[in-house]
Amino acid sequence: MLEIKNLTKSYGDVLALDRFSLDLKKGEVLGLLGPNGAGKTTLISILSGTVGGFTGTVNFRGRNLFADREIKNRLGIVPQDMAFYDELSAMDNLLFWGGLYDVPRADLKKRAVELLELVELAARAKEPVKNFSGGMKRRLNTAIRLLHKPDLLLLDEPTVGIDVQAKVSILDIIRGVGAAGTAVIFTTHQLAEVETTCSRVAIMDRGRVLAQGTLDELVRIVGERDVVDFMGDFAAAAFSDAVRELAGERIELLSAADGLASLAVRDTAEVPRIMDRLFQRKIAVTDMKIKSPNLETVFLKLTGRTLRD
């Protein structure tokens, strides 16, 4: 649905995007993850048409996004700055914006009702927006950008500056939009948001995509492995001897001490084979824990720094 190739943008001597490339399919929710200055907001600004002076191509549904007004109207853009009238009700704001989006008048009221239910504001549809909390306003802002049923929704840091409950609501909305078939790109520097919300992840740093895919695919790209900890009544030497013949490309002994040992495995399907060997060697294991690589591990491996650096 969306194909970005070699997108490059500079601000003076600063390279904000460096041959940025990305693909997105219908219904995919892609989290664009990176530290401040990675180029996330620049990308959203280019796609939304507010920043020019770049090179590269962006095709949306097989057509040039910037040369085809009709295709560009299939985007929904949710900026951090919210645009609505505080004195009007939530419903009246939706009706006003629906007119600007050329939503057919016969369909507009029904669409507004559907969206107020989606963002959990139906009970306060007739209330002036000035009475809403920051999180409620953020949800209404998202509803407005969904009025024309876009094929692609762009959100720049949608959970910044709102409380935890409001963040949960926004992320639920994003998941629901993706499940309904709309492709979504949202920028964030919050690992947990990406892990719980996205079907795919793109990790950015210094204007480039370092890797993209599902979390499992990213783990394979960086070569991270699951770590299995074994606890029990055994000697370090006995445990090491027991697993030595299993060690290889798929299994590695990381550490062994009396009563505690750790193995790295390429696939947790190896665990039953390991347990069989330990049982055969009479290694008394009383507990076992599997620690899978997470997004923070992958990010650190790719960038050499944490999001907080």
Predicted segments, located by residue:
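Conserved ABC ATPase "signature" region
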Residues: 95, 99, 106-124
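ABC transporter nucleotide-binding domain
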Residues: 171-265
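Catalytic Walker B motif of ABC-type/P-loop ATPase nucleotide-binding domains
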Residues: 153-157
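Conserved ABC transporter NBD signature motif
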Residues: 56-71
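Walker A (P-loop) phosphate-binding loop of ABC-type ATPase nucleotide-binding domains
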Residues: 35-39
